[in-house]
Amino acid sequence: MQEWLKFKGKKWQQIIDVDDFILNNYKEYKGSSDFLKGMSRRTNKVWARCEKLIEKESTISILDIEDSYFSGIDNFENGYIDKKSEVIVGLQTDEPLKVFVNPFICLDSSLQVVKNNGYRFDKDTVNRFKDFSVSVEDIIEDTYTEDIKKFRRLHVIEGLPDNYGRGFIVSDYRRIALYGVDFLIAKKLHDLDRLKKDINYSIIRTREEVVKQINALNDLKSMASRYGYNISRPAKNAREALQWLYFGFLAAVKENNGASIPTGNNSPFIDIYIERDIENGILTEELAQELIDQFVIKLRMVRFIRTPMFNDYFMGKTPIITETIGGVYNNQSLITKTAYRFLNSIENLDVDSIPNFSILWSNYLPDNFKIYCSKIMLEHNVLEFLNDDLTVSSAVTGTSGKSKIGKQIDYYGGNCNLAKALLYSINGGLDELTGEPVIEGVEPISTSNLEYSKIAKNLTIVLKKMIDIQSDYANIVHYIQDKYSYESIQMALNDTVVERYITFGITGLSTLVDSLSAIRYSNVLVKRDENGLSTDFQSQDKFPRFGNDLDEVDKIASDIVKLYYKILSTKSFYRNAKVKLGIDSNGMNVIYGKNTGATPDGRFKLVALPSAANPTSNVDNSGLFASLKSILKLPSKVCTNGIVTTVNITPGALGSKKTESVENIISILDNYFENGGNHLELNILEKNEMLQAFNNGNKYSNFVIRNSGCAIKYCNLTSDQQDSLVDRTYHKVL
């Protein structure tokens, strides 16, 4: 086949196996970043228009709304930013930054956003949809138990995708470039033909889904043909490879509105095409960088209609679009020149929250690449780092969880409010703010002094009930999502039979742990209202705090996580999904805190909870390394969806010279991951910078920071979210 000329290997030519293609053809790069080029003239023209549009968008929230057509892979006319200058084409609608309504997920709430922004959606289109279909948000409330409704209303368990798209699915968009869509359709037809023996409910459902996938692949071909491209065949050069890949991602965007839409781990794959083109004399380094820069620009143009509730759950208005960089095979890294080119787009296009670059860190990374990443971190707080699991095609799904591309999918199971769990243990299963009964069988504690043994016993009862409800909640949501808003194109680019996982998060861990430490190692008095509900707590002695490398409190943290996972692992989940637990928050620490009473650790009523695995703000005062050592004691074996850790470091703590700072960043990352760390993101800044951004938002429109596994534009946060980020520990010593 002409498109595969000079490519090595045979297995990948006979079956779908992108890993085999990469391992037979990629070239590890260990050199420096000296080869990189700046922005091309064409890219400069494209990005200049985007910057103006983004600036305008920031003043009015939503720049434009499609009010005649609903979402769909092939539902919109072509869209361009600057047609003559674009080398990678395609937009989610016919104009840049123009959002659409996805009726299959959240019709009525989206139409309210449309109305609030001064638009009126075509009534006939809405009525036709309602006559023949239903939105997830319309039907899902009827399927909830009363317990689920109560837990959602009281902010005990939230964040599940019942009024937004699921997201977190890593699809193998590379397959389009390597094989062409016709090959993929033929493979799906072959799979469909095999699904005909011993017909039962499971096989019927799979057959129905495969048919939807085939239809989506045909829609994908049609959408690409509008732009003048025939993606039925494999890509024949680097430009086509990136364009084909992008068309797949764009199709996913057009039928979705998920919180996270990961792109995968694409740099080694694309690099193979770029290196072949450079060798053949049809591509220069400047043109190679131009391809990557313009691909990144397209990712930065993705927008969805977001409800106020969504913005409370997830920080920032833009979706989490994660591009993973790294990987290891046979003691050799998957770092290529294109890994550098992706990160160089930050320099060329300036800092942004998209893509969410995730670096898989390991001892096998070339030293020069470690240096380059550290230099990027010093100048821009945009990278996150994860411990490499040493697989070829592993990609980050959203914040810290990883999946094998094309082989596994994650269902998001929401986050549990651990601070509420503690207060229910203290208040006999009653909600501390409303007084209504929430959990039965919890022994009331009427004494003014809290006894650790009684609290611990009650906490186990509370957690069992909360996990029961969370499991039911997740199973219902994903059944309804599959039935009414199935992600046809994303699943079409995965194996027909995939490993399914369901991921759960816990929020407020350090609040719970510090509170239990206070109860165990201090004398904690409870203040109660006239109904006997706790309103405040007073600790009469100092007590050990999580984040200071103190075994007595760090063990409490480890035991809590193990207990949570032990209970969770006894549950059965939708489509036999395997459970994964993560310590993360996705921004829900703020909304949870705003609906949670005072806690025994000294946290005031309605104050935000700590983010993810972070210690409580400003109590981890023994230095950065002590804080990280506490986190390293958390049981990573049961937290297979990640332990999200965000740290703020003042520049002076890293050294007075740039070379010293770079060396210290590398040392921090090497030591943390060598000792079993899972995830780490660094904000290198002074608190005053955060305060300046808080008080002068219009001057800091491009101020980006890291939080809970995401790069976030500070100006896109609510005031409560900004407050929670300003009030963080800023480590001045290592």
Regions found by a protein language model. Give the residues of each.
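Conserved catalytic cores of very large enzyme subunits
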Residues: 2-734
